[in-house]
């Protein structure tokens, strides 16, 4: 009987520790995790030669975005994979930037370069989808781009492709910015189809906001 009681108390203690860990995990991630899209693009094991031998660690390239125009890239390094991913997520959130969108696509064609990576992005009509490779697709989906044509013209290395895609997105400009710089009406610098798509997307967003507040 004593052994059974001891075993039962040990199980209770283990269960208690597990519950405390679960609560800690929820408290650590909180609601932030549910509000963002996270994509792990690559995980690599690296080694460092020291006096006593080799020390191994892991690196993780992570993309984080809200699916509504905000996206960031992070690179984490740690002795364990989960810790490396967590560091990558934290860095990605610090590197957030806004991507100008017209409806579900980008504002104009653009090409970005980073190291040996070269990525070309072109707007696409609704229903086209994200036509892109794995690394570029992760960035575009996290940014909230649903219709786009992307092509890698340089290195196929995932890190280079990701940074080239980010460089291309950072080159995007809103029609208002171009019109103000040239001193022209917005109708003279943006196609009528683009302006129509933007009005429709703004109307849909306003309708969704009204339904949410009702």
Swiss-Prot record:
Region Disordered, annotated ranges: 1-34
Biased composition (Basic and acidic residues): 14-34
Domain S5 DRBM: 36-99
GO biological process: translation
SUPFAM superfamilies associated with the record: dsRNA-binding domain-like (SSF54768), Ribosomal protein S5 domain 2-like (SSF54211)
Gene3D superfamilies in alphabetical order: 3.30.160.20, 3.30.230.10
Keywords of this entry: Ribonucleoprotein, Ribosomal protein, RNA-binding, rRNA-binding
InterPro entries (UniProt xref): Ribosomal_Su5_D2-typ_SF, Ribosomal_uS5, Ribosomal_uS5_bac-type, Ribosomal_uS5_C, Ribosomal_uS5_N, Ribosomal_uS5_N_CS, Ribsml_uS5_D2-typ_fold_subgr
Cytoplasm found in the keyword field: no
Record keyword Ribonucleoprotein present: yes
Alphabetical list of Pfam families matching this protein: Ribosomal_S5 (PF00333), Ribosomal_S5_C (PF03719)
Molecular functions per Gene Ontology: rRNA binding; structural constituent of ribosome
GO cellular component terms, semicolon-separated: small ribosomal subunit
Family annotation (NCBIfam families): rpsE_bact
Subunit structure: Part of the 30S ribosomal subunit. Contacts proteins S4 and S8.
Family per similarity comment: Belongs to the universal ribosomal protein uS5 family.
Described function: With S4 and S12 plays an important role in translational accuracy.
HAMAP family linked: Ribosomal_uS5_B (MF_01307_B)
Comment field on protein domains: The N-terminal domain interacts with the head of the 30S subunit; the C-terminal domain interacts with the body and contacts protein S4. The interaction surface between S4 and S5 is involved in control of translational fidelity.
PANTHER family, per database record: MITOCHONDRIAL RIBOSOMAL PROTEIN S5 (PTHR48277:SF1)
Protein name as it appears in the record: Small ribosomal subunit protein uS5
Gene responsible for this protein: rpsE
